[in-house]
């Protein structure tokens, strides 16, 4: 297990308004989730807050998914006060809208970096990392090691994100410069915190639920009584396994069926 070094701000909590408008020579940039409701990218354009913006899937292997693309946005300096007021009131979008950071790197350097980091390695396979979704990235960033920072967050000097409260991160002093040619791996320590997060557990529960209906439809219909109860029961089953210290990342619908069969057999013999 890799030990994460906490990099949260140890001072009193900082509001969006304070952070966005404090004296700093590093410009503010946003990673926005265009699938959040309402679309925060549209909100930025509607309010004329955009200095520069670009969809990160454009020109990459994910270009066919352009409508789902995260956006890199540099906000106009004169609008930071207004943006801060909206974010403080949680009026921009839902809780998946994205996050903000400061950087001294050029626009092109940042754009190149983020486009290369949309794909990461998970269990030896290349997968899309939905880092623009606060529920995904926010579950992991607190566990980032200096090595994770140097690779995934190479341009970032400071980062602000809405977790249980607005949280401010500084770049760890131990960070190197990073190398975009080195693939970023979602290590065991990041997978662990992801699966222990409410959204991570819900995503896995939904995956098992869909697997059951697609591959074991008859059994899924039988188990889904009363109707709509199956997915919450799967989530509860996974949570119990986590609390017992068991690994759940490779669980499938078949595993759930087997567990239910064993449970029924035990009940029969009682």
Model feature map: region roles:
Residues 2-13, 17-20, 25-58, 103-270:
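A contiguous, surface-oriented mixed alpha/beta subdomain in the mid-to-C-terminal portion of proteins
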């Amino acid at each position: 297990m890799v030990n994460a070094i906490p990099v949260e701000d140890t001072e009193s909590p900082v509001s969006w308004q304070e952070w966005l408008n404090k004296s700093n020579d590093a410009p503010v940039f946003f990673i926005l989730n265009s699938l959040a409701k309402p679309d925060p990218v549209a909100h930025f354009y509607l309010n004329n807050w955009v200095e520069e913006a670009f969809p990160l899937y454009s020109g990459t292997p994910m270009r066919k998914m352009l409508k789902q693309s995260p956006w890199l946005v540099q906000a106009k300096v004169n609008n930071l006060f207004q943006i801060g007021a909206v974010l403080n009131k949680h009026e921009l979008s839902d809780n998946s809208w994205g996050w903000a950071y400061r950087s001294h790197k050029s626009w092109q350097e940042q754009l190149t970096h983020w486009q290369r980091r949309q794909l990461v390695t998970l269990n030896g396979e290349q997968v899309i990392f939905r880092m623009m979704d606060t529920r995904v990235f926010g579950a992991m960033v607190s566990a980032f090691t200096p090595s994770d920072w140097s690779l995934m967050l190479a341009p970032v000097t400071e980062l602000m994100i809405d977790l249980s409260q607005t949280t401010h991160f500084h770049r760890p002093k131990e960070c190197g410069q990073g190398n975009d040619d080195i693939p970023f791996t979602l290590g065991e320590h990041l997978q662990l915190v992801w699966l222990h997060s409410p959204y991570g557990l819900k995503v896995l529960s939904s995956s098992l639920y869909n697997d059951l209906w697609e591959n074991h439809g008859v059994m899924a219909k039988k188990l889904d009584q009363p109707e709509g109860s199956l997915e919450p029961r799967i989530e509860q089953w996974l949570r119990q396994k986590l609390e017992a210290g068991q690994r759940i990342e490779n669980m499938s619908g078949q595993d759930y069926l087997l567990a239910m069969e064993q449970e029924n057999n035990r009940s029969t013999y009682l």
